[in-house]
Amino acid sequence: MKTDFLVIGSGAAGLSFALKAAAHGHVTIVTKGEMNECNTNYAQGGICSVTYAPDTFEKHIHDTLVCGAGKCDPEAVELVVRRAPELIRDLIAWGTRFDKTPDGRFELNREGGHSEHRILHHEDLTGAEIERALVESVRKHPNITVLEHHFAIDLLTQHHLGEFVTRHTRGLTCFGAYVFNEETNEIETMLSRFTIVATGGCGNIYSSTSNPIVATGDGIAMCHRAKAITENMEFIQFHPTSLYHPAEKPNFLITEAMRGFGAILRLQNGEEFMDKYHPMKSLAPRDVVARAIYREMTRRGEDFVYLDVTHKDPDSVRSHFPNIYEKCLSIGIDITKDWIPVTPAAHYCCGGVRVDTNGQTSIKRLYALGETSCTGLHGANRLASNSLIEAVVYADQAARHTASLIDRTDFQEGIPDWDFEGTQHTEEMLMLIQSKREVQSIMSNYVGIVRSNLSLKRAMRRLSILFEETEELYNKTKPNRELCELRNMIAVAYLVIKQGREIKESVGCHYNIDYPKQ
């Protein structure tokens, strides 16, 4: 099949791009699960935008740069911060409902690392509200086709025309993707003028993550195999406060907005401890808080610390955090009376596929958006609630850029269909599940919040064995979702380890005990 715009992924980045691009051509969205099964849907806290005085663009820029620990791209920071208000208006026009005060002004939260209240939100379910509005708008649009349960396997380039390509090949171009239709078990060749990869993050390379089970790094892995450049993959952000409930996957997030509301981190003996680590205490940047919790837990041999909001007005707590209140109540915790057991969990990939200010990768006609991309906004550590606004700003940038090129961009002919010769259906499902767990174990044990040269070396050695075994199976097997996800998880884990070994310092989310000074 042919489509003007092939969008892979259905979170805020992919859907907002689709709504903009549909004015200039036909858009096909492929997503491996249901349309709302994405990281956006799990984002609780909110979305950043300078809205009222005394906040200013300069303050938001400063907070982002400080949190990014010297690794941000100032041009990307400036772009996102200054374009944010305009894109917030677009989200509202598509039907997003942000909370307001009784006098009709937007109710703004403050989270870790922010100097002002600038986070628009919908209760404690902001991502779900944005996703709802976008999904409804997309489903009504006559120029957008949505294909659920379609898994993009690989991107099409000159490699599929028989050419030898590397990351340095001039004119390397993307022509579309091979997509696995889970309903027919067929692999479809989808040709496009432009391909937009917006598949979200890779939290499931770790045992404990706030990400949904679909977050297996598919887009980053596909782009890497297609020879796109990736960067900053070592900067995996761990959210400091996921609900400690070992039986549940994914980890339920306790939003950072709760600490902005006044919640206090405590040890199991009731002692406050963040004042030992940062002047902003419980409102310190995420990497600082996550490492502090990790150190205190390790020192005491404990699995969690507490988050205490019992000193705040109960009615106010329930109205600000209704989802968290109901969730905790369902497991016997009344957050207006009881402390909440919390533990860090893998949350966000600050790196990804390198893109320019138009969202274009190092491969022509290939764009990466949202958590799949590395725009340079986040540097070594993402500022809370900067991700959703980055997604919609860069989606708009990419939509504008592709619209300017569409009239002189044609489909590539001569791409062969998928070759099934010599392959068979696998009956090794149990082995695939076990291999996924091995990847998660390697990453959690050796490439977590605190790392070392030895742990990274050991992780690479163990992952290499899994890589060889999985490639051998892949080459003789008809693709299925589980095998492709495992292959992608291994590819992304490799990038995290490799780039972690290359950086000879501790900075932001990457803390190596062999380079302790930050």
PLM regions with names:
Residues M1-T3, A12, K20, E34-N36, ...:
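Glycine- and aromatic-enriched mobile tails/lids
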Residues G33-L65, A69, Q237, E248, ...:
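Conserved N-terminal glycine-rich FAD pyrophosphate-binding loop of Rossmann-like flavoproteins
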Residues M35, M222, A228-I335, I340, ...:
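An anion/pyrophosphate-binding glycine-rich loop and adjacent beta-alpha core
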Residues A93-E186, L191, A198, S242-H245:
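Conserved redox-cofactor binding core of oxidoreductases
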